[in-house]
UniProtKB/Swiss-Prot annotation:
Family matches, as InterPro entries: Daa-tRNA_deacyls_DTD, DTD-like_sf
Gene source species: Nitratidesulfovibrio vulgaris (strain ATCC 29579 / DSM 644 / CCUG 34227 / NCIMB 8303 / VKM B-1760 / Hildenborough) (Desulfovibrio vulgaris)
Alphabetical keyword list: Cytoplasm, Hydrolase, RNA-binding, tRNA-binding
Protein known as: D-aminoacyl-tRNA deacylase
NCBIfam families xrefs: D-aminoacyl-tRNA deacylase
GO biological process, one term: D-amino acid catabolic process
Function: An aminoacyl-tRNA editing enzyme that deacylates mischarged D-aminoacyl-tRNAs. Also deacylates mischarged glycyl-tRNA(Ala), protecting cells against glycine mischarging by AlaRS. Acts via tRNA-based rather than protein-based catalysis; rejects L-amino acids rather than detecting D-amino acids in the active site. By recycling D-aminoacyl-tRNA to D-amino acids and free tRNA molecules, this enzyme counteracts the toxicity associated with the formation of D-aminoacyl-tRNA entities in vivo and helps enforce protein L-homochirality.
Keyword Cytoplasm carried by entry: yes
Location within or outside the cell: Cytoplasm
Annotated domain remarks: A Gly-cisPro motif from one monomer fits into the active site of the other monomer to allow specific chiral rejection of L-amino acids.
GO MF annotation: an example: tRNA binding
Description of how the protein assembles with itself and partners: Homodimer.
Record family assignment: Belongs to the DTD family.
Catalysis: reaction(s): glycyl-tRNA(Ala) + H2O = tRNA(Ala) + glycine + H(+); a D-aminoacyl-tRNA + H2O = a tRNA + a D-alpha-amino acid + H(+)
Length: 162
């Protein structure tokens, strides 16, 4: 699982020129799943650690302006957007290959579970795009602060099943 996390003042998703989701201050999260991610991932320590890390990242300012507060403490929202292109392979030629991305059905199930699990941790503060849709994503970066989280890099010792 890969997450690109952006701290935003606001963000939104439109599909066919129709607003689907909007948030105020918080995190825009692009979420992608790899071919090694499967239906057992949500039951793993790795999955829970990624969910907790996402909402507990201390990237919001405290009273002194230092990045010292989490989303949970700050009170912001989350907008989750599926993004299979996070698994693009650019080593050959000029056209990206997506062979390392999870199959669409698997990715859809994992994405929907991610939305559910983040919402369980932050009830009523989570919005999402539409899986597989051509989306227009808008945002106003705050900082900017952009972080890339890859479960295989952050938790190499944790097996997908463990």
């Amino acid at each position: 699982m890969r997450l690109v996390v952006q701290r935003v003042l606001e963000a939104g998703v439109r599909v066919d020129d129709t607003p689907v989701a909007t948030i105020g201050t918080g995190l825009l999260v692009l979420a992608g799943f790899g071919k090694d991610d499967d239906e057992t991932l949500p039951d793993s320590r790795r999955w829970n650690a990624m969910c907790d890390k996402l909402i507990d990242l201390r990237i919001f300012p405290d009273a002194e302006g230092r990045m010292n507060r989490s989303l949970r403490e700050h009170g912001g929202e989350v907008l989750l957007v599926s993004q299979f292109t996070l698994y693009a392979d650019l080593r050959r030629g000029r056209r990206p290959s997506f062979q390392t991305a999870a199959p669409p059905d698997t990715a859809r199930n994992l994405y929907e579970r991610l939305v559910h699990d983040i919402d369980a941790r932050l009830p009523g503060r989570v919005s999402s795009g539409i899986f597989g849709a051509l989306m227009h994503v808008s945002l106003i970066n705050w900082g900017p602060v952009t972080l890339c989280l890859d479960d295989a890099e952050l938790f190499p010792e944790a097996s997908v099943a463990g």
